[in-house]
């Protein structure tokens, strides 16, 4: 007997509409891959009468998101409305009744992820959020599956496609303001880009990765961050003359006293994985005790990258229903007393005389064992 799951979508903006169309068009292919069928039951939107993609029937739309998440015929909720207040309550209600959830809401997960993951685990539900971490790059699945039996030493990367796009444009001669305006036109930056350029977005992603890699209930406000707003065209030009590039790097590692984590613009060699990023590309470097150094790269911004990650999570949930596995809910709370803060990561990096306010990235700081890092 074929298993069929009811799916509901919260939000039908640019990304939501793209995901809704993918759910409709890829249904047969996904069923062949997973052995599980699904039916799109409802789409919650603010205005159900607004013009929507032709592939979506009018009957699917409703303005009552709460009735959607509490519908017993819905076994999987895909949340793409963003924000934290309404989204938190909606996801809590869905998870509380054992409904699986896929979300791209990094702002919510970076502050309430540990609580929501614990709730999911207690109810036997899955909470998947690949799109919230690295766009099209399968970082979460790599940590959850391929490296589940290994010990993660560190994670570092260029995790914000908007900032990479801006810095790439500045390398071509644009000012910061001109580069930011271009990123908006290309769809890589929001109308208000402060969440990206001030470093909040990659800090949110580091918090999520700390939950996945280290089982630590870290929230993003505790992570030191410096954005790219103070980077000038002169900084970028000087770096290029030295064979370097400026990139916003997010990095963290475990030490014996706790976590070291930071987001800041640093200098990277042009030939380094971080230096080879361009446009909206993201790259993440994971160092594990047995597997060594692994590098994942791909698109980190835009609707297509987000859709790819969301659909990958949908497939993962459906496969889990066919071959039932325990959801990942191992997060515990790290005791952060005043004397044991989350320390900044980049303090041990060297400086370059020509650009003294920026530090020079060194891979060596990511691969040392925890005991050695204590004395770094």
Set out the residue ranges of the language-model regions.
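Flexible, glycine/charged-enriched surface loops at secondary-structure junctions
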Residues: 37, 196, 217-223, 248, ...
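General beta-strand structural signal in soluble alpha/beta enzymes
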Residues: 61-63, 70, 78-79, 102-104, ...
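Rossmann-like NAD(P)H-binding beta-loop-alpha module
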Residues: 121-191, 196-201, 208
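Substrate-binding/catalytic subdomain of NAD(P)-dependent oxidoreductase enzymes
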Residues: 169-170, 178-283
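A conserved regulatory-domain signal marking ACT and ACT-like small-molecule sensing domains
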Residues: 309, 314-376
């Amino acid at each position: 007997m074929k298993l069929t799951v009811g799916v509901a979508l919260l939000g039908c903006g640019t990304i939501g509409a793209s995901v809704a169309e993918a759910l409709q068009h890829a249904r047969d292919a996904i069923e062949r891959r997973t052995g599980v069928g699904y039916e799109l039951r409802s789409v919650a939107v603010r205005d159900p009468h607004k013009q929507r993609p032709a592939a979506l029937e009018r009957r699917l739309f409703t303005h009552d998101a709460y009735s959607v998440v509490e519908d017993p015929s819905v076994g999987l909720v895909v949340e793409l409305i963003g924000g934290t207040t309404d989204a938190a309550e909606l996801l809590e209600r869905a998870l509380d009744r054992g409904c699986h959830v896929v979300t791209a809401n990094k702002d919510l997960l970076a502050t309430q992820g540990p609580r929501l993951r614990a709730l999911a685990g207690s109810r036997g539900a899955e909470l998947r959020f690949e799109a919230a971490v690295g766009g099209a790059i399968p970082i979460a699945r790599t940590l959850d599956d391929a490296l589940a039996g290994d010990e993660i030493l560190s994670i570092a990367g260029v995790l914000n496609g908007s900032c990479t796009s801006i810095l790439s444009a500045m390398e071509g001669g644009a000012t910061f303001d001109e580069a930011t305006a271009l990123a908006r036109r290309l769809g890589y930056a929001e109308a208000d880009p402060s969440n990206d350029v001030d470093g909040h977005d990659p800090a949110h992603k580091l918090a999520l990765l700390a939950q996945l890699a280290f089982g630590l209930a870290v929230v993003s406000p505790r992570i030191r961050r410096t954005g790219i707003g103070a980077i000038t065209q002169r900084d970028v030009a000087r770096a290029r003359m030295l064979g370097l590039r400026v990139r916003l790097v997010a990095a963290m590692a475990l030490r014996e006293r706790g976590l070291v984590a930071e987001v800041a613009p640093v200098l990277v060699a042009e030939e380094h994985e971080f230096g080879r990023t361009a446009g909206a590309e993201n790259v993440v470097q994971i160092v594990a005790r047995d597997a060594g150094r692994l590098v994942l790269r791909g698109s980190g911004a835009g609707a297509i990258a987000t859709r790819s990650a969301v659909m990958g999570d949908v497939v993962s949930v459906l496969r889990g229903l066919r071959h039932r596995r325990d959801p990942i809910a191992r997060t515990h709370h790290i005791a952060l007393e005043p004397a044991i803060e989350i320390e900044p990561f980049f303090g041990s990096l060297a400086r370059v005389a020509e650009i003294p306010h920026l530090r020079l990235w060194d891979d060596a700081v990511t691969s040392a064992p925890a005991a050695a890092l204590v004395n770094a």
